[in-house]
Regions:
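Conserved phosphate-binding/catalytic region of the ribokinase-like
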Residues: 1-5, 199-309
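Ribokinase/PfkB-type carbohydrate-kinase core domain
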Residues: 1-6, 68, 93-232, 296, ...
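Glycine-rich phosphate/adenosyl-contacting loop at the front of the ribokinase-like
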Residues: 1-72, 308-309
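Short beta-strand scaffold segments in enzyme catalytic cores
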Residues: 39, 86-90, 221-225
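Short phosphate-binding/catalytic loops that engage adenosine nucleotides
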Residues: 46, 72, 154, 211, ...
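Beta-strand->loop->alpha-helix junctions that form or flank phosphate-binding loops
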Residues: 53-55, 74-82, 214-216
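A glycine-rich helix N-cap at a beta->alpha junction
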Residues: 64-85, 92
Length: 309
């Protein structure tokens, strides 16, 4: 049994705080949307499993070790004939982060439907979380994602997470809409809704298929729309924090929402925890390093600059 199962690619990451071509110090870590969510949910006290493949190499072992250290059950296949993906972050200016991928043909792109369905059968997860990144990696990874959502009785969430460098908007829309009939909760930024609905009112359209649509809009906050006899719409503003690095904020938001879902909290409380987790993430560099524990969740109620003694 596991509370949450997620699947997808995690890469070794290198980050510099200036243009990378200038050299100098760099930080080595790991990065991947699904593992970011896994770490966030695990830090909030839940049992979490992450399924993927990595190369039989040192970057792959770094990923496994890091996730295990974060109390995530890392179900990893080490591939001898494929490599661990790589991602680089650099900053051409203080408030702009540039991302470079090296992931085509990576080990994670070889994830198979048999692997995902076997994990679901073994683990009987309460929730399954998928993103639009995994099916963009390869036809095999797309089939693995579809198999996961089609063969489970668990509640499934989907984060659209469109990546233009991985596939076109047309290809993304076709695959994401194939997933939708099996999805309970959809997460999307306000500029991604057209990928999953052509309707003039995409929220109303989506709520004919899914139970909940959560829309994020950066500094404007987030909205949750739930299918009820009288459709329930909730808004939460972005919390007032000093933004250092926004990379990973969406994954942090999702992790807070899924944790609150596992705790059977109200739609309002789910959005509150999601907003809090997202706010924590942007206060430091890194995709996941500043994600909160359960004890941390109340810290942002203190005034900025407070010293807790």
């Amino acid at each position: 049994m596991t509370d949450l199962l997620t699947l997808g690619e995690t890469m070794v990451s290198v980050r510099t705080e200036r243009p990378m071509r200038l050299g100098g110090d760099a930080q080595l870590s790991i990065a991947g949307s699904e593992s970011n969510v896994a770490i966030g949910v695990a830090r909030l006290g839940h049992d979490v499993t992450w399924l993927s493949a990595v190369g039989n190499d040192e970057p792959g072992r770094l990923i496994q070790r890091t996730l295990r250290a974060e109390n995530v059950d890392a179900r990893v296949r080490f591939a001898d004939d494929a490599f661990t993906g790589f991602i680089a972050f650099d900053q051409p200016s203080h408030d702009i982060t540039r991302v470079s991928y090296h992931r085509r043909g990576s080990a994670a792109s070889t994830l198979t439907p048999d692997e995902t369905t076997a994990a679901i059968t073994e683990l009987s997860p309460t929730l399954i979380h998928v993103t639009g990144i995994t099916p963009a990696l390869s036809d095999t990874a797309r089939a693995a994602t579809l198999a996961a959502v089609r063969t489970t009785n668990a509640q499934v969430s989907l984060d659209v997470n469109y990546r233009a460098r991985l596939w076109s908007r047309a290809d993304a829309a076709a695959t994401l809409r194939e997933l939708l009939p099996h999805i309970h909760t959809v997460f999307a930024s306000d500029d991604e809704l057209d990928l999953i609905s052509d309707a003039e009112d995409p929220i109303a359209d989506l709520l004919q298929t899914v139970h909940t649509v959560v829309v994020t809009a950066g500094g404007k906050g987030a909205w949750s729309h739930t299918r009820t006899p009288e459709p329930l719409a909730i808004h939460r503003p972005a919390l007032p924090v000093t933004v250092v690095d926004s990379v990973g904020a969406g994954d942090a938001f999702v992790s807070g929402y899924l944790s609150a879902t596992l705790d059977n909290l109200s739609p309002e409380a789910r959005l509150d925890r999601a907003s809090t987790s997202g706010a924590f993430c942007v206060t430091a560099y890194g995709d996941w390093e500043s994600l909160p524990t359960r004890d941390d969740l109340t810290l942002l109620t203190h005034a900025q600059g407070t010293a807790l003694r």
